[in-house]
Amino acid sequence: MSRWLFPWSSSIKTRACRYLLQHYLGHYLEERLSLEQLSLDLYNGSGRLTDIHLDIWSVNELLDSAGAPLEIIDGFIGSISVTIPWSALVTENCTLEVSKLQVTCRPKYRGAAQGTESQSWSSCMTTSMQLAQECLKEQPEEPSEPPQPIEGLEMFAQTIETVLRRIKVTFIDTIVRIENNPGDSNLGTALEIHIKRLDYCDEAVRDSPHTVPVDIHQPPAFIQKILQLSGVSLHYEEFKTSVQTPSPTPENPLESEPVQPSKTPSWPEEPQPAPSPIQQIGSCSGCTELTIKLKQNDLFPGPKLDIDGKIGSVHLFLTPRQISNLQEILDALSISESSAIREKLLKSRPLDLEDLKLIEQDLNQQLQSGPGSLFVPDPELVPFQTIENGDMFYSMAAMTNSMTSIRSANELSDIDLESSMYSDYSSQQIPSLTPGIMLSSPRKYGRTPFSATLPQNLHKLPGKSSHPPSMELLKPEMLLRLTLGGLTVTVPHISTYISPQEDPACPEVARHFFRELGYFKDSAFSGRDFSHLRGQFEKACHLSNIRVTAVAVQLVCEQRVGGGTHQSSVDLSCGRLEILECLRQGESTSRRTKNTEYTKLMTFCSPSTSSRPCAQIHYKRSQKTPTRSSRKKQEIKVSSEILVELEEFQTDIDLGLLDRLGSIFQNGACRESYSQNDLHMTDVPQSSEDMEIRVVASKSHICLQFPVPDLRPSLERRPWAEKAVRKDCLQMEVADLDIHSQSKTGTDEARKIEITFSDLHGVYTDGEKLNVPCIRVSKGADPLAKAGGKKFIFPSILVAILPQSKVSPWYLAQDKIDDIDHPSVESPCELKQPEPSPFSSKRTMFETEEMVIPADPNEMADFQHVTLASSQYTLEITLPRAHVFFPSKEVYESLYNRLCNDLLMWEPVPELGASISDSLLSAEPHTTSNYQQDTFRMCKSAFKLDSDSDDEDSHFYSVDEAARHRRGAQDGQSYFSASVTILKGRITAWTEAKGEGAKKLDDHHGEVVLDVENGCIFSVSKYRGKEDLSYLCIQSESVALYHKATVKDYLAPVSLEIPTFLHPTNLDPTIYLSEEGVSAQLSGARKDRNQKMLSLAVRIDLNLVKNVKEFLVALRLDGATLRHHMALPYQSWHSQILDFLDVVDEPILGYSPPAVITVLHTHLFSCAVDYRPLYLPIRVLITAETFTLSSNIVVDTSTFLLRFILDDSALYLSDKCDAEVTDLRKDYVCVLDVDLLELVITTWKGNASSKLTQPLFELRCSNNVLHIHTCADSCAMLVNLTQYVMNNGDLHCPPKPEPPTEIAGQKLQPPEGPSSLPPCLPAETAQINQGDLTDALIDTGRTGKEQPETAISVDAALLEESPVSVYLFPEEIKSGNKRQTTSPSPPPLTEGRVSQESLGLSDTSGDSELTDTDDFCILDAPGIGVPPKDGEPVVRKLVDSPIAVRDGHFSRPLGSTDLLKPPAKFPVPETRIVLREISVVWHLYGGKDFGSSRPNSARAQSPRSRTSFHNARGSPSRSSVTNRPQNTWRTQGGNGRIHDILMEIQLTKVSFQHESYPEPLADGEEKLHTGDLDELPLARQVFIVQELEIRDRLASSHINKFLYLYTSEKMPRRAHSNMLTIKALHVRPEAGLGGPECYLRMSLMPLRLNIDQDALFFLKDFFTSLASGIQTIVPMELGSEASRLDGPAKSSSDCELEQETSQGSTEDETMSPSSSTDQPIYFREFRFTSEVPIWLDYQGKHVTTEQVGTFAGILIGLAQLNCSELKLKRLYCRHGLLGADKVVSYALNEWLTDIRKNQLPGILGGVGPMHSVVQLFHGVRDLFWLPIEQYRKDGRIIRGLQRGAASFGTSTASAALELSNRLVQAIQATAETVYDILSPTPPVSRCALDVRQSRKLRRGQQPADLREGVAKAYDTVREGVIDTAHTICEVASRGHEQKGLTGAVGGVLRQIPPTVVKPFIVATEATSNLLGGMRNQIRPDAHKEDALKWRADEGQD
C-alpha cells in the first residue's frame, strides 16, 4: 500500500488504477475505460466509476459455464462507488455501491449437464490465500522445490479474508429486465424487476464493530450472506421485436429451417396487439430479507446453497394476457434440454429410393427364409411376454413407415434409429408408445420381428414407473425458504363491453389499482379474516376480477442431485387462503352504481378451529438423464408429483366461470398450439414426463350452481362476463375428498383424474326456504376383501382424457384383418368379427321382422370396453351405496331441468370454448387430423407379386384403398363416454295421491322405492365421431320396486341416510327378482346363466336437417316377478310413476327441441305376475317365457302403435294362501297354457274435423294355441277369479248375483216367463252375457251372399201383444210414465222389415250343403210366383226379347272376403277389437285339483294317464294346433286330478270382432237408410269358429271324437267355411230411450255325435260341479283371513239380509239415469239361419238308476243308437227377447218341440240295426222310383236307371253288408263265449289275447277296401291255425314236464273242446274283415267315419 502513498499526481494514480481495472475486468467491459469515467480519492479510500457498458459475450460465457438459463443481451451500470476505510480496514466495513444497474436478459438452453451450478459457486469464489500468493508472487517460473509456508503470507491472506468479509454491497435503483421473443410473433414481452435498494453483507460481521477471527487454514464450513431488499416492484411491457445481439451459444439449428405451410395446422390467426407501454403489475410492501447460506465443505451435511427469505407482502395485478406471456417466460426459463442430443438430430436424413429398395429386398428375403431364422429369443422381451395381452405388439407410433422394415438384428443394432425420422409421416406426428397391430405374437415366435425398434425399457408395465432413487443417495444442492406475510393476486376479466378507459391493459387501470393499494397495503392482513378487504379492493379495481388472498405463506424449495438424477421439491403452505370472483354487474357507466357479486371459488373455515395451515402444496420433480453410452436407446425421464392438502373448505361451482376465465387460457392455448406445431416439425421428444397430482381434503362444502343456458347466436347472447345462474343450487358436503390425476406426456396414454371420497350428502335448496336432502353416497363393504386389505369400496369418479390421435383396439383389429391377412381378404367365406354394439348380434326373427334385443352381458361389456378405450373423454363413476330422494314432483321436475337441461345443454362461448377445453382438458392439445397415425402395411413383394404388373398392383391397391375408405368413413373417436356403476342404490319418490276423478287427496301421498344392485349406466355421445349418433345402456343384476298408493303425510328427513336395502315395511313389493320356486320351473331360467335382470339399450339418432331425434329403445327384463295390486285408476303404481315422470321441459334460449320418435322394444324373459286377491282365497301366478312389446311413440303425432308378443306363458292357481314361499311345482296348478299370442294396439287422436277416418282405438289379437287344463273345482275357481277381476273385487265386495235358473239339467229355480221378470235385472247377468261375446277369439274367412228366404205371411200371432210389453225403461220409470209400452205391429216383410245385409248380418251358409247336389230343385224362392198345382216346375218367360248378357256386370273381388268386415255403408267405428287365428283346447279332467283328496293309485298310474293325452288326434280335415310337447309337470295338475278321465274341447281358428260406433251427436248424424226405417248402429260383434270338436279321452271309452263337423261325399265341406257363426248388431232404440237393442243371427254347420255313456255322465257331472262351485258372493267381512269356499255355509238369515241389501242397492241404481247400461240386452230380433242336421251314435254300457230314475236309467244303459238323425230347424223370432237366457230358452224350446213332434222317426231309426234296415228298403225304393221320377221330369229314363242303380248299390248293398257283418260278429261273440267256457284255466293260452286283439281290430282297424279285407282275412286264418297248433304243443310240453306222458295226454285231451270251437272264431273274424272291406269299398265314407269314431290301437294300450 505504501507505493500508493507516494507523492504521485492524481492523473498518474488514475491511469494506473484504470490500467489495473482494465487488465482484470476489461474483458467484461464493452469499451475501454476512459479517465472521465473514473474518479479516485485513494487517501480517503474512495473511488467512483460511471457509465459502464458490459460486454455481453464475456458475461454470457461466464453464465454459460455456470449453466444459467439466461443470457444477457444488454447491460449497463450507472455508477460504482467504492469506499475503503484505510484507517480501520479490519474493523470497519468496505462499502460498494452500485447505482442504476440495468441488465436485460433472455432465456436460453443450458449447455451442460445438470449439477454444474454447485461447481460454479466454488469456481467463482477465489480464496484469500490464493489471492495473497498472486499479489506477492514475483517470478512466474515454478520453484524447483515445494514452497514453504511464509508467515507474512498467512498474515496477508488473513487480512484479505477479513476485508472481504466486511464488504457491504448496496444496489440502488436496480432494474433487471427479462425479455422473451417468441418466434411466431413480432411482439416481445418483458418482465422488469425494479429494486429500490438492495443491501448485501456477511451475516457474521453485520452490526459487529469487532474484528472477526479468521482461520485461513480451516475456512468456515458455512458462509452466510444477507440480502435486504426494499421498494421492489414488478413491471410488464410489450415491445416490437428487433435484431438483438447474437448469442454466443449456438441457437436451435432447426429454427432456421423454412417452415412448410403444409406441415403447420391452420389455426385462426389473432390480430397482433400494438406495443403497450410499461406498466406495473406487482409490488412488495415491507422489508424483504434473504439469508444466503453457502456450504464450503462437502463433508458437512446440508445443501450447498441455503436461502432463507422473509417478505412482508406481495400484491400482483395481472391481466390474462400478461399471465399467459409470463407463463411463457417461465416455460422458456425451465427448458433444460441437452445440446448434445439436439445436435444428434443433424445427422438425420430422409430415406431415398435406394433405401426403400434395400429394405424391400431384405424383407422379402427374410420372409422366404421362414420364421425360424428370423426370431431369436430375446431375454429383454421375456418380461414383456407376461403381459396380459401378450399377442399385442407395441411399437413407436411415428415409426410406421419403411423405418420399421425388418432387418437383421446385427444390422439394426448399429443403425441409429433417428436416421429415418424425417421420412414420410414421421416428421408430422407426435411419436408415442401406443398399442400397434398384432403382427406377430411373442408367444409364438419368442420374439417380435420388430424387436429392434422397440424401446429397451418396454418390459416395464405401463403405469408402473421405476422407483425413484432414495433420498439418501441424492445430495442436496439448494434449499430455499420464503415466508410471505401476505399475498394478493388480482386478475381482471377481459370484456368487450367495457370502455377503453376500463381496459385492464390500460396503464391507467393499473396505476389506479396500485395507487389505491398504497392506502391499505400495510394494514391489509391485520384482521382475522378477509371480509374487510372486499370494500378496499372494490375501490382499487372497478372491473370484475378473480382475487387470491393468502396470509402466512411459506415456500420451501429443495434441489437434490446424484447419479444422473435431478430432483426438486417445493412445499407451499398458507395459513389462511381465499379465492374469490368479484363480478361487477350492471351496464351503467357510473362505477358506483354497479352491483358487486362474489363467488366463493375457495374459502376456508375460521383458522381458530385448527392450528394447521388451511392449504399445503407439495411438489416434487425428478429428472433422470441417461448416460452418454445409453443415450441413444433411452430417453430423459421426468416425473412430477403434486400433493395438495386442504382443510375444511367451501367452493361454488359455476360453469360460467369457464367463459369468464377463458381469456386467461385463450392465449396460452394458442401459444401451446404453435409450440406443438413446432414440435411436429423440429424433433421428436427426448423426454417423457409423468405428472401425478393429488388433492386431499378432510371435508369440503361444494355448492353447485346451475347456469342459464343460452344457445342463441353470439351477437344475441347476453354478455359472457355477466353471471347468469339459477336461484336454486345443490349443496354437497363431501368427506375425505381425494383427487388424483396422472398423465404422461409424449405418449398416447390417457390422462386420468380420479376423485374418491367416503361420504357425500347433497341438499337441494331453492334459494329461499326449501332445503331438501336429495342424495347420499357412502362407502360400502368390499365382499372380496382379503384379511389385512382394504375392507371398503369408496365412491370414485374417474375422468380420462385421450389424445385425438389414439387408435382404438377395434380399428387395429380391423386393420389386421384388412391389411395384413390378405388370404382372408381373398376368401369370401370367412366371416368378419361383428362390430361391438349394445344390441344383440344374435338375430332373432318373428315372422319377417328382426327383433331388437339388448346385448347379453358379454357383448355389452365388450361394447363398453371398446368405446371407453376409444373415447376422447371418459367418465367412470362408482357408487358403492347411494340413496336418492325426491319429496315431490315439483322437486324432481326442478332437478330434472337443472341437471338435464341447464347443465347438459350449457355451452361455453364459441370464441373461448375451444381454448378452454384444449388448455384444461386435452392431454395432447391440437393434434389435428392431418397427422393421423398410420399402421404398418407389408410390402407387396412379401406376397411374391410382380411389382411391375399394373393389374395386380391395381388389385391390391383397390383392397388397400377399400380398407382406407371404410376406416375413413367409420374411424374416429367417440367424443364422450360416461359409465356409472351403482353397487347398491335406492331411489325414493313421493308421488301425488289422487282419488276418484283425479282429485288430489289431502294429507296423503304415494311412495315409490326402487332398489338397484350392481347396476350400470353407460352413455356415449358422438359415437365414433358421428355427430348425430349416441347410445345409452342400463344394466342391473337385481331390481326391486316397492309401492304404496296412499300414505299419510309425515315430515321429510332432515338428513338423508343410507338405507339397509331391505324390504320397506310400509310398502308393498311390486317388482322383484323371482323366487327360486318360480324361476327354477321356467325353461329359460338356468342356474349357470349370467343374464342381468334389467338390460336397456338406446340408440339415439339426431337428424339435424329435419330436426328429428329418433330413439331406438330395447328393454330386457329377465327373471322378474310383478306383484299385482288392484287399485283405482289413478292409484296404480304405473300411473303414479308415469304421472311423476311426466315433467315439463323449461324452454332454453336459442334452442328448438327436435321432434322425438321413440321405437320401443320390450322383452320379458322368464317373468311372472303374482296376484293375491284380498277377498278370494286363491293365489294366481302368470308366467311367460318370452314377452315382447314393440311400439312407436311419436310426439305430436296422431297414431300410436303397440305390439305384444307372448310366447309360452301359463296361468297357475293355488288354494294355499298361507304359504310364505312360492313353490310353483308344489303348490300351484297350471290351468291355462298359451303357446304364442300376438296383440297389436293402435290408437288415433283424431283430427280437427271431428269426423273419424279410422278407429280411435283398435286391438288385434292372434295366437297359435291356447290350452286350458281344469278339473271342475279349478275351472270354477278360474270363473270366480274372472268375475272377481272384472268386478274389481279388491276395491269393494262384489254384489250377490241372482241364482242361475238351470245349469246342467238341474233346476235351481223355477223358470220365469218374460212377463214375470223384474223391471231391472242384476248388473252381473248382463255382464256375464256380454262376457260370452267378449271371451271369443278370431279368424279370417269369407262372406257369402245371404240367400233370400221365403216370404212368410204375417202370422196372426205376431199381431198379438208382445210378451215384453211390461218392460219399462229406466227413463220412463224416472219420469213417472207407468203405462205399458206395446211394440208397434211389424209392417209387411217386403217393405218394413230391416234389411239384414244392411245391418251386417249376411248369411254365411245356406241349405245347399244339406241338399242333394244332383237335383237343384228350388222349391221356394222370392220372385218365383205362384207354383203350379201339380208341383212340377214350369219355365216362365218374363221377357220375350232375347236376353243380353253383359260381361263384367258383377265386379270380381280383389281377394278373399273378410267375414269380420262390416258392410261399406257402415260408419267408421270408434273402437275396434279383433281376435284372429285363436285356437283353444279345453282339457276337462276328472277329480279335483285342490283339496287333500288323492285319486286311486291304480287309476292314477294307469298307462292311459301317460299316453292318452299325448296321442290325442287332431282334426282330419285340417289341424291348426301344433303338436308342441307340453310340460309334463304342468299337465300333472293337483293331487286329486284323475288323468284317466279326460275330455277335450277344441275350438280351431276362432275369430271375433267387436266394433263400437260413436254416439249420435245431433239430428244431422249419418244414419243407415233401410227402407222406411233409419237405424243408428252403436256396436257390432261377429264371432266365428272355423271348427269345433269334442274328443273323448276316457280310459273306459273307445270313442275318439265325441262331436265334430259332419262331412261326406254328398255333403263335402266347403273351403273357408265356418262351423259356427254368430253376428250381433246393437242399434239405438227407436224411442231413443233405454239401452241398445240387438239383432242376433246365428248359423251352424252339420254335426256328428258319438256319445259314450261314461263320457256323457262325466260331462254332466263336470258341469254340475262347475255350476255349484261358481260363487260370486263375497262377504264384506272377508279379508286376508277369508274362509275357504268349501267351508261351512252361512246362516239363512245372513244370506237373506245380504240379498235384501243387494236388491235395495239394485233398485237404487235402477232409479239413476246411468243404470241402463247394467240392464240385460234386449234382442229385437233373433235368427237361426240354417237348418242343422245332426247324426247321433250312442253306446250304452251300464244301467244307472241313482241320478235319472229307474226307467230312464234302464233306457240309457241299454240303448244303442247308430246314425240317428235329427235336425235343428231355422228360427226367426221377431217379438223380442230380454236377456241372453231368454234367447237360449226360446231356441231350446223351439227345437225340442220340433223334435218331439216331427223327428222321432229319425231318432228311432238309429236304434240297433234299424238304420241298416231302413237303408236297405230305401235303396230298393230308389231302384224303382228314380227312373220313373227322371222320366217324368225330362224323359231320360236311362239317367233314371243309372241313378236308381247307384242308390241301390250304395244304400242296399252297404246295408246288407252291414247287417251280415253284424250277424257274423254276433256269431263270433257267441263262439268266443263258448271258447271261454270250454277253455281250461291253466295254462293261460294266447287265445284270450287273440280274442282281445280281434275285438280291437273289429272296432278300430276295419280294412279300407276289399283288397285289404281279403289280406286281413287271410292273415287271420293263418295266424289262427298257427296259434292253435302252438297252443296244443305248448300244453303237451308243459304237461309232460309236470306229469310225464299222462300229463301230456291229459293236456291235449283238455284242449280238444276249445280247439274245436276256435275255427268258428277265426272264420267269423275273417268273414268280418272281408265283409268290412267290401262295405268300405262301396262306401268310403263309412271307413272315414269309423276312423274318426274309434280310437287307434296306440290310444288303448
Curated annotation (Swiss-Prot):
It is found in: Preautophagosomal structure membrane; Lipid droplet; Endoplasmic reticulum membrane. Residues 1393-1408, 1493-1532, 1690-1718 have a biased composition (Polar residues). GO terms for biological process: autophagosome assembly; positive regulation of autophagosome assembly. Its main location: membrane. It comes from the Eukaryota. Keywords: Endoplasmic reticulum, Lipid droplet, Lipid transport, Membrane, Transport. It catalyses: a 1,2-diacyl-sn-glycero-3-phospho-L-serine(in) = a 1,2-diacyl-sn-glycero-3-phospho-L-serine(out); a 1,2-diacyl-sn-glycero-3-phosphoethanolamine(in) = a 1,2-diacyl-sn-glycero-3-phosphoethanolamine(out). Residues 1311-1321 have a biased composition (Pro residues). GO terms for cellular component: endoplasmic reticulum membrane; lipid droplet; organelle membrane contact site; phagophore assembly site membrane. It is a peripheral membrane protein. Residues 241-281, 1292-1323, 1371-1414, 1492-1534, 1684-1718 are annotated as: Disordered. Residues 17-119 form the Chorein N-terminal domain. GO terms for molecular function: lipid transfer activity. InterPro entries: ATG2 (IPR026849). The chorein N-terminal domain mediates lipid transfer activity. Belongs to the ATG2 family. Lipid transfer protein involved in autophagosome assembly. Tethers the edge of the isolation membrane (IM) to the endoplasmic reticulum (ER) and mediates direct lipid transfer from ER to IM for IM expansion. Binds to the ER exit site (ERES), which is the membrane source for autophagosome formation, and extracts phospholipids from the membrane source and transfers them to atg9 (atg9a or atg9b) to the IM for membrane expansion. Also regulates lipid droplets morphology and distribution within the cell. This is Autophagy-related protein 2 homolog A. It comes from Xenopus tropicalis.
